[in-house]
Design a protein with these regions (language model features):
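N-terminal [4Fe-4S]-dependent radical SAM core
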Residues: 2-24, 34, 235, 239-309
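Flexible, glycine-rich loop/tail regions that form catalytic "lids" or insertion modules at the edges
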Residues: 27-31, 73, 201-204, 296, ...
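Conserved SAM/AdoMet-binding glycine-rich loop
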Residues: 29, 45, 59, 65-68, ...
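N-terminal pre-triad scaffold of radical SAM enzymes
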Residues: 30-35, 298-324, 357
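Glycine-rich beta-alpha loop elements in corrinoid/cobalamin-binding modules
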Residues: 42, 61-260, 267-268
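Terminal amphipathic helices with adjacent charged low-complexity linkers/tails
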Residues: 66-67, 196-249, 262, 271-274, ...
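Flexible glycine/acidic-rich beta-alpha junction loops that bind and position SAM and/or redox cofactors
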Residues: 90-99, 147-149, 179-184, 211-213, ...
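Conserved, mostly hydrophobic/aromatic
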Residues: 171, 282, 316, 320, ...
Length: 653
């Protein structure tokens, strides 16, 4: 194990600058997350990228925004700009539940403390910096700013908000994965350009006077409905989102313009997807993969989750309506080379507390590595936000062969016992049968490889609902495909003598979901022998099609009306059906079903109910502790022929 010195981390204090003999830095990054020097943490990625290009970079993690602002003063002024990177999650999702209740833990803070970040740190940090150093440019990045780059609905304020540049008074947003635009910005500022004159860097957002918008270079413009129009007309807001989503996922996107008062928000098209060499260069930077030494003895929950995981690609072509990944990373997959992946795995193997098991070898989705369009010219003209919904594109290469090779190459390394897959598996890709028989054989081979060797007892998948009308709104495959995959999963388990569980994820209160749909979900999952635990109430987050439908009441593509459960009472009534098996929920559910006129479902949920036998509580508690990911069962939930007894559950191999 390599011993790291304090100077192996990016500096966070004046003392650490002195150790490097630096009297000044080029860029200072302010982050609302703890500083973890790991490629899964955005501030570390940008900091290491700039460092590799020869710039001096410092990070101020979780500054105190109260009192005399000493954390904002301690490193002085940077030569080029302040970067505000609020964190890996939207701050309001991080702090509050779907019912707007304060969360008890912040996964990105030491010991899970929830008082170390403000609401909207993008705005709070920027306003402080502008107050202290009005002449120094402030550049925003990260998920919070990226998803608020245009007029958006804010669930926690329950109103539309303009581009976050208007509220924060920052100079620029770098949206999405920011290595390339950040490097280009540094280069321009280094050459003496004023940030107000830099208007042509891809993947940036800035405000211009409405009567003096710079001419687009090499692209067309799409003029969106103004912020003021959207405030008055929800349909206009819905119309905007179709353009926003399409331009976020095109090979050759248009520039977006939106008027806000006397200003115009200008969103430049994104950079093309990174090449494999470029992505390798980002992941191969000298990360220590450790929290900064200032956190010694403290637990950072998010780091513990990804400590022994390795990311193998960027991008996701699933296009799920409630997900921000396509708007942030795009739908085109960029893969790391096998050599780069193995290099990082070897680094994990050297960690002193690594016991031989990788917790995840995946990405935004588990099984999209190596996939993309066969005919690239067709992809260049494509406007679909998803390559697999409503049907899998016939141009998509769904061959899993490269991914199988990655798994086997990793498992062959000395020091690796098992590599598990913690990312969500797209079972629709596994079930799909194309005209390419080699790809079909690889899908079958991958499915067996996955279940036999890469499941740590429980496999996570995300059907999200059972009602096809809701699944269409979510852009998820029909529920029958989940049934088909579960049957395949159970068959392979039986053939291999395994006793694994499949853990389905579900969402309530999604646009298009009525209470009766949730009642049907309860009955169907009960018939499949699930006691659901991995569930969530839909939370409207900025810049997703689901949020736009929830707020406006319109489908942004068809402009047809869409129902959404909005009041807390409606949302709780939908959520209760997840927990039909809890005795304390039965009376309320029965009352709700009768009010719906669906008393027939009562018998389906509780027919032949009998007292469960007393469990061995020692074993039961142990099982519950292991089973934080979902189905709270003490036995496996495979489908069995009538009359066949359930096999006893066996712990993880």
């Amino acid at each position: 194990m390599k011993e790291y010195r304090l100077t192996d981390f990016l500096p966070t204090t004046k003392k650490e600058l002195d150790l490097r003999k630096w009297d000044k830095v080029d860029v200072i990054l302010f982050s609302a997350d703890a500083y973890v020097d790991h490629p899964s943490f955005g501030a570390a990625v940008i900091g290491r990228t700039l460092e590799a290009a020869g710039y001096r970079v410092a990070i101020v993690p979780q500054p105190d925004w109260h009192g005399d602002f000493r954390d904002f003063k301690k490193l002085g002024k940077p030569r080029l700009f302040f970067g505000v990177a609020p964190g890996c999650m939207d701050s309001m999702v991080n702090k509050y539940t779907a019912n707007r209740r304060l969360r008890s833990e912040d996964a990105y803070s030491p010991d899970g403390r929830h008082d170390l970040r403000p609401e909207y740190p993008t705005i709070v940090y920027t306003q402080i910096l502008k107050q202290l150093y009005p002449e120094v440019p402030v550049v925003l990045g990260g998920i919070e700013a990226s998803m608020r780059r245009l007029t958006h609905y804010d669930y926690w304020q329950d109103r539309l908000r303009p581009c976050i540049l208007c509220d924060s008074h920052a100079d620029m947003i770098i949206y999405g994965m920011g290595e390339k635009p950040t490097l280009e910005l540094c280069k321009r500022l280094d050459e003496g350009y004023n940030i107000g004159d830099i208007t042509d860097i891809p993947q940036t957002v800035y405000l211009a006077d409405s009567n003096d918008v710079p001419t687009a270079m090499g692209t067309t413009d799409i003029v969106l409905n103004s912020h003021e129009t959207c405030m008055k007309d929800k349909r206009a807001e819905a119309e905007n989102y179709r353009h926003i989503e399409e331009e976020s996922n095109k090979m050759h996107a248009s520039r977006l313009l939106q008027n806000v008062g006397r200003k115009t928000v200008v969103v430049n098209p994104p950079y093309p997807p990174m090449t494999t060499d470029e992505l390798d260069a980002s992941f191969d930077l000298p990360y220590t993969r450790l929290p900064h030494p200032k956190y010694k003895g403290k637990r950072i929950p998010a780091y513990e989750m990804i400590k022994f995981s390795v990311n193998i690609h960027r991008g996701c072509f699933g296009g799920c309506a409630f997900c921000t990944i396509s708007a942030h990373q795009g739908k085109f997959i960029t893969c790391r080379s096998k050599e780069s992946i193995l290099k990082e795995v070897r680094q994990v193997i050297e960690m002193p507390d690594f016991k031989g098991n990788l917790s995840d070898l995946g990405g935004p989705s588990a099984n999209m590595y190596g996939m993309g369009g066969r005919n690239k010219k067709a992809c260049e003209k494509c406007t679909r936000p998803s390559c697999i919904n409503p049907q899998i594109c016939p141009n998509l290469n769904t061959d899993h062969s490269k991914l199988i090779d990655i798994y086997r190459s990793v498992d062959a390394l000395p020091g690796i016992r098992r590599s598990y897959i913690g990312s969500g598996v797209r079972y629709d890709l596994l079930l799909y049968r194309s005209k390419d028989e080699n790809a079909n054989r690889a899908a079958a081979e991958y499915t067996r490889e996955l279940i036999e060797r890469h499941v740590s007892g429980r496999l996570k998948v995300a059907p999200e609902h059972v009602a096809d009308n809701v699944l269409r709104q979510m852009r998820k495959p029909p529920f029958q495909q989940f049934r088909d995959f579960k049957r395949l999963f159970d068959r392979i388990n039986g053939e291999c003598g395994l006793h694994q569980q499949i853990i389905p994820y579900f969402i309530s209160s999604h646009p298009g979901c009525h209470e009766e749909d949730m009642a049907e979900l309860a009955v169907i999952t009960k018939d499949l022998d699930f006691h659901l635990e991995q569930v969530q109430d839909f939370t409207p987050t900025p810049m997703t099609i689901s949020t736009e439908a929830w707020y406006t009441g319109y489908d942004p593509y068809t402009l047809e009306p869409v129902f959404s459960a909005k009041t807390q009472e409606e949302k709780l009534r939908q959520r209760q059906y997840f927990f039909w098996y809890k005795p304390e929920m039965r009376r309320d559910i029965e009352r709700s079903l009768r009010a719906l006129g669906r008393g027939d479902l009562i018998a389906k949920l509780w027919n032949n109910t009998q007292q469960r036998p007393t469990l061995d509580m020692t074993r039961h508690k142990s099982q519950q502790a292991k089973n934080k990911n979902g189905n709270n069962r003490t036995t496996d939930n495979r489908e069995r022929p009538k009359g066949q007894k359930r096999r006893p559950y066996r712990n993880d191999r």
